């Protein structure tokens, strides 16, 4: 069974300066080491080494100081084998880093039975990336979310006064309501019109915030 040091050595040998530059431009802080591997390459390693069956190693990867190793661990970890204490520990560790890591953590939490408890707490956080995770989790549970209409109204009323990445995730929540909740489609369109253009600092990149109205319309038209 592969070890932490062996994985670290393998990833370091695959270091990609171009991807490192891209990831730094997307917000990966200098406080984190970075080899610049693409997600597809990380997934190949997970399959080859059967990392999803090595829980202890996945935890060790997540608690390292290398963004690639952390994300590798997040992709490999079993959501139901981690504790709420570990999740909060990782939230604290990642909330001032960058969106790839918090996206990965939110994706894990979304697969748990207690996901909505985290979402409810996290959207009230003082930390932008933590709040963003809360809204991401709500989006991923849209089909089993009794409070969806209340949250949609909150997004409509407060999005433009929210912090940076939280605006991005709230915009995503409006889009999700508009596409996947027939009973909220019209209200989501109204919310998108009321909110208007959403500005998010996405770093030194060409990435753009999706326009909610056109995104919803295109997605709905594809399903007709």
Swiss-Prot record:
Q: Which InterPro entries match?
A: ARM-type_fold, DNA_alkylation
Top-rank taxon of the source lineage equals Bacteria
Q: Would you tell me the protein name for this molecule?
A: Uncharacterized protein Lmo0209
């Amino acid at each position: 069974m592969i070890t932490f040091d062996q994985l670290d050595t393998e990833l370091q040998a695959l270091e990609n300066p171009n991807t490192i530059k891209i990831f730094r431009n997307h917000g990966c802080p200098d406080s984190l080491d970075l080899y610049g591997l693409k997600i597809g390459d990380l997934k190949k390693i997970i399959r080859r080494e059967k990392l999803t069956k090595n829980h202890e190693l996945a935890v060790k990867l997540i608690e390292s100081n290398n963004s690639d190793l952390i994300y590798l661990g997040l992709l490999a970890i079993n959501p139901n084998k981690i504790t709420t204490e570990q999740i909060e520990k990782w939230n604290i560790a990642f909330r001032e880093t960058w969106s790839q890591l918090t996206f990965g953590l939110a994706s894990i939490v979304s697969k748990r039975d207690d996901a909505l408890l985290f979402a409810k707490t996290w959207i009230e956080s003082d930390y932008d990336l933590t709040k963003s995770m809360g809204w991401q989790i709500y989006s991923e549970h849209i089909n089993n979310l009794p409070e969806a209409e209340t949250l949609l109204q909150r997004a409509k009323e407060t999005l433009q006064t929210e912090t940076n990445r939280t605006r991005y995730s709230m915009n995503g929540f409006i889009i999700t309501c508009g596409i996947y909740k027939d009973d909220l489609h019209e209200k989501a369109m109204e919310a998108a019109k009321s909110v208007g253009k959403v500005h998010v600092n996405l770093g030194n990149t060409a990435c753009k915030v999706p326009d909610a109205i056109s995104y919803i319309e295109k997605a709905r038209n594809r399903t007709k």
